[in-house]
Amino acid sequence: MADPYRVMTVCTGNICRSPMAEVVLRDRFEAAGLAGRVVVDSTGISSEEHGNPIDPRAGFALAARGYGVPVRSARRVRAGDLVAADLVLAMTEVHAQALRRIAGADDAAVRRVVMLRSFDPAAPHVAPGAREHVLDVDDPWYGGPDDFEVCLTQLEAAADGVVARVRADLAERPART
């Protein structure tokens, strides 16, 4: 069997947006019949929440829409994560910039960093080299339940586009004998 395609979602502390995106994407990959070929993980650019579980408000939002709530611990992204991933999905422009700095001189790793909302067909188009902030996934941390619902809606809106991209990437991988 071929190595799995690795998707990593990244936010600030790895307790709200990125684990929610991880859950949504795992669900969509399973529905698309790709669960055995794709591994989804999540991290944060900060170590401030390291070891903490998913924010309970994120868990409530996921459960309200029928998703399972993962038992997991937040962790900070490492350079090795960027090397191992096939696709790195940043929640904001600030996250994307931080990830590209972490990738450093590894041009391939830099190219694998993509804004998650760029896969949402209703999101604004951003020209190459232009500012990406218009694609930021709203941070629900300082808000209430409605803010987590908005965030989850943004994540779901991009998920099918991510699945299509991964499916296309998998089709281009050479067959192993």
Kindly label every feature range from the protein language model.
Residues 4, 87, 93, 97-177:
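Phosphate-binding/catalytic loops
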Residues 1-85, 164-174:
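Conserved active-site segments centered on acidic
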